[in-house]
Each structure stands twice: as C-alpha cells, then as structure tokens.
C-alpha cells in the first residue's frame, strides 16, 4: 500500500511544490525531484535481500516503515529543495525495501494453498495505495482558477501548505504499518534456515496447527539438505541461467517502460496540454486510479483461467492501442 502511495503522491503535489521551489521552468530540476526517489528505490531493492537474510524479514520491514514515516514528515516540512530531494531519496529506499520484501514475506508465511492468492492481494494493495494517494491529493488541494499564474499558485494555500499536507497524509498509513510490523511474526522459513527450528515450528503451528507445522518444517529442511551451495549474484553468470535471466530482466524493463509511470507522475503536463486546468488534472488522475484498481481486480479473477502469458499479451496490446490514440488525440 505505502509503495503505491509514496510512488504517486508526488504527481499530485507536483504543480504546487514546483512553484514553491521556483523550478517550474527548470526541466532538469523537475526531473531530479521526480527521479530522486527512484535512485533510493534502486539501492533499497538491492540491499533488501542481503539485509533480510542476515537480520530477518521482520526487522527490515520495521525499518522500511520507519523510513516511510521519516519521508512523509520530512518531505512536507522542508523549505529547501536539496532537503526535499534527500527525503525523497529516503522514501525511495523504503519503497525499494518494501517492494522487494513484502511479496517475499507473504510467500514465506502464507499456507501453500493460499500463497498465490495472497501474493496477488499484495499487488492489489499497491494499486489501492495509488488510488488513495490520488484521492487524498484531490481532496486536499483547493480549487485553482483557470488561467492562474505561477505567482498566484505559489502564493496560494496550495503552493505554501497544500503540497505539504499531501506528503504528511502518508504519515497515517506509515504509522499503522510501523505499529503492526511489531505484531507480525518472523518468517518461519527464515527462522528455519537460520537454525531456529523451535521458533519456526511455533510460527507454523500458529498458522495452521501442529500437523501443518511439522509438514512445512520437514519440507523446508529437505529442501535445505538438497541445496549444494548458497545463492548469489555470481550464479546469474552461469550459462544455464542466461535464458531465464534475460526473460526476467527484459520483462521487468519493458514493464517499467510501458508508460503508466508517465501517466501517474506527469499527469500535470499531459492533461494540461490537452486543455485541462490544475483542479481538473487532479480529478482526472483519480479516474485513472479507479480504472487501475478495477482491472487489477479483474486480472486477479482471470489470471489462473487465462494464464500469465495471455494476460501479458492482452495488456501489452491494449497499451499500444491506447497510447497510439492518446498521442493522436493531441493533433486532432
């Protein structure tokens, strides 16, 4: 949820913080403000696996929750563009950790027959976070008159305080995440792989009873016995891994290049170029978020029936058609 919220909140705040920091006519600084979180996200994703393998899943989830609180409070409180980007970097680091570790934790703690469904629900919470952020931004911002100048927006409540409350609003779900993270059990699979057999057995018993606990623990121990070497980045250089690695990397890259990030984060430019005012932009972003949630739920219901590949092809073709029409609409 917080991954989606923090990723998109900046899109609604963008028309206002750019005026406050005086970067409305500086594309380089605009790009830096938008991409600074992605740099933090890169380092968070790279470090999440190593940190969670060494310290456990639960402590790193608590760390991510604390960082989300830090970025929510700090980003809204700053008066310096440099500090704004520092806190966005911190938020990006939290996103990187959460986006990597949350699906892993869910897969490790969920019963086998519910594992796929729970991981799908994780994706649903991401898009719900996106939609919540869009609705909150829309409700916080005061109406902006058509034809309002940069100076008028900068001196307005939106330009001075509105964008800050958009970031501060994230403190509520971040604080809930932080508190409930202490209640979460540690991953029983991590406990078992770390030699804490009794602790793992206790968690599995809480989840599915004694028989389930014994069966799951035996399966983990059997898998560990068959493992001849530890996994690591060096194994990715094995020629036998090239095909799988290529598919995984290319799919991930193309997914990020599909264009939805532009729609969410640069909605201001896209909709204003189509003739909408700032207030209309914030409302239209909510419409995109609702559509996102609807089709995510639809995909959850049909993915097992249609298959992953079919849904990927349908989605890719749909995006290509939609973006073609969107691009053409600016000329007709």
Roles of regions detected by a PLM:
Residues 1-205, 222-332:
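Alpha-helical transmembrane bundle of multi-pass membrane proteins
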Residues 206-216:
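Short intracellular "coupling" helices and adjacent cytoplasmic loop segments at the cytosolic face
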Residues 214, 221-222:
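Loop segments that connect adjacent transmembrane helices in multi-pass transporters
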